[in-house]
């Protein structure tokens, strides 16, 4: 969804037809993205460092008319530090830059009502035999739990592993 959103924004600004049924957007002065994982080990830069440098570039140069897309910021460190860094970046973008921002995270504490949260939900209409699950963007914070164990089942993990994963997941909710 994030990559497609970035692609549609750039294509529309170039005057190209975007691959969607419906779209409304404001022209952006810049588009900043941080998606995927990339390191530059030859330069001595880990995936986490590159991720932080990309985020810093967006914070330094984004304006109110920019689009910033960040996917799982903070995933390359401990949960404690990751949520702190992601929360700080999100707060800065919301309060200082005030740009349009698509911010994907697994940190539920960052999903605040004033930020217009949405979540990716597994399509209930999808066929159980589908190899690739279909997701839909839904408004609001994601419900407790995730589709992780269901996807692990589809991937063929052993029943013993799935049972233990369900127990651990339940205990951590």
Question: Could you describe each region identified by the protein language model?
Answer:
Residues 1-173:
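ATPase nucleotide-binding head domains, primarily ABC-like/P-loop NTPase cores
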């Amino acid at each position: 969804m994030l990559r497609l959103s970035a692609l549609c924004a750039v294509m529309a600004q170039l005057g190209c037809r975007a691959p969607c049924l419906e779209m409304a957007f404001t022209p952006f002065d810049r588009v900043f993205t941080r998606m995927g994982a990339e390191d530059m080990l030859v330069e001595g830069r880990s995936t986490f460092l590159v991720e932080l440098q990309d985020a810093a570039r967006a914070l330094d140069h984004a304006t109110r008319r920019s689009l910033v897309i960040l996917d799982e910021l903070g995933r390359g460190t401990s949960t404690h530090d990751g949520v702190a860094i992601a929360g700080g970046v999100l707060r800065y973008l919301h309060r200082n830059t005030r740009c349009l921002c698509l911010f994907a995270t697994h940190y539920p504490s960052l999903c605040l009502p004033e930020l217009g949260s949405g979540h990716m939900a597994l399509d209930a209409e999808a066929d159980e035999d589908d190899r690739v699950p279909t997701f839909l963007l839904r408004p609001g914070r994601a419900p407790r739990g995730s589709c992780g164990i269901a996807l692990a089942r589809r991937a063929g993990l052993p029943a013993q592993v799935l049972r233990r994963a369900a127990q651990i997941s339940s205990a951590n909710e």
